[in-house]
Amino acid sequence: MGAQLSTLSRVVLSPVWFVYSLFMKLFQRSSPAITLENPDIKYPLRLIDKEIISHDTRRFRFALPSPQHILGLPIGQHIYLSTRIDGNLVIRPYTPVSSDDDKGFVDLVVKVYFKDTHPKFPAGGKMSQYLENMNIGDTIEFRGPNGLLVYQGKGKFAIRADKKSNPVVRTVKSVGMIAGGTGITPMLQVIRAVLKDPNDHTVCYLLFANQSEKDILLRPELEELRNEHSSRFKLWYTVDKAPDAWDYSQGFVNEEMIRDHLPPPGEETLILMCGPPPMIQFACLPNLERVGHPKERCFTF
């Protein structure tokens, strides 16, 4: 009798075990390995490619631990690069332009601040020049995820007031974005996440400020997204020095630009900002307030 029960249990359990094993294999396949497992640990990643985008802008590609790894960075978060330069520890935040749809690598687009270019900063940018001088095969330490905002999809933003606060989830229909220079990278991250989901009906409005037309980072990528998703992504530029044939705005971000090219204030509108602190403090915040956007619906990366 015991032998019969044992045989019966194997007959009953075998299909169950088969289904369980199949489920586990599928689950494992659908969950790629994550590089940034612990935000307190530094992960050395190897430079595998360097692309010249413009006279002072580069795209750096770093290999993840395996071709099956993803970075593991939530939308809206950033990483820190750290290294020693002239004996001193230098740490800088960056937002990748690649996403977790990309396996095996992470891309950073960086504007290189060369020495003896700007009279106020004769030494140039320490980290950007370090990256510029890296050789293929060299490594640098990544740490993350970091940041106070996460885009959860379908208009939902989880925002914390500080690192110790619990996130508050805001659901919106429109996102107004003001970016200055390299501040475009977190905006592009959010825009791509919205547009890749056909069921996400959030509309993104980007006002992108630069010194000149040649300084506009990632312009081909932005305009391709606008052309493919014209009803869901609105794009406008302003530059300090405009060429003769220029179809966009000229000058610092002002009240008129915000009224004309960002969504109106409302319960279903969120404003995101990223750029030089003087731009945020003196151009963005005062003019957003004049237009009627409340501070609690404005977030600065």
From Swiss-Prot:
Its EC number is 1.6.2.2. The modification N6-acetyllysine is found at residues 42, 50, 120. Its cofactor is FAD. GO terms for biological process: cholesterol biosynthetic process; nitric oxide biosynthetic process. Changing residue 111 to E/Q: 2-3 fold decrease in Km for 2 Fe(III)-[cytochrome b5]. Residues 40-152 form the FAD-binding FR-type domain. GO terms for molecular function: ADP binding; AMP binding; cytochrome-b5 reductase activity, acting on NAD(P)H; FAD binding; flavin adenine dinucleotide binding; NAD binding. The keyword Flavoprotein applies. GO terms for cellular component: endoplasmic reticulum membrane; lipid droplet; mitochondrial membrane; mitochondrial outer membrane; mitochondrion; nitric-oxide synthase complex. FAD binds at residues 92-94, 109, 111, 114, 126-128, 185. It catalyses: 2 Fe(III)-[cytochrome b5] + NADH = 2 Fe(II)-[cytochrome b5] + NAD(+) + H(+). A lipid is attached at residue 2 (N-myristoyl glycine). The modification Phosphotyrosine is found at residue 43. Keywords: Acetylation, Cholesterol biosynthesis, Cholesterol metabolism, Cytoplasm, Endoplasmic reticulum, FAD, Flavoprotein, Lipid biosynthesis, Lipid metabolism, Lipoprotein, Membrane, Mitochondrion, Mitochondrion outer membrane, Myristate, NAD, Oxidoreductase, Phosphoprotein, Steroid biosynthesis, Steroid metabolism, Sterol biosynthesis, Sterol metabolism. Disulfide bonds: none annotated. Catalyzes the reduction of two molecules of cytochrome b5 using NADH as the electron donor. Belongs to the flavoprotein pyridine nucleotide cytochrome reductase family. Component of a complex composed of cytochrome b5, NADH-cytochrome b5 reductase (CYB5R3) and MTARC2. Interacts with MTLN; the interaction is required to maintain cellular lipid composition and leads to stimulation of mitochondrial respiratory complex I activity. This is NADH-cytochrome b5 reductase 3. It comes from Rattus norvegicus.
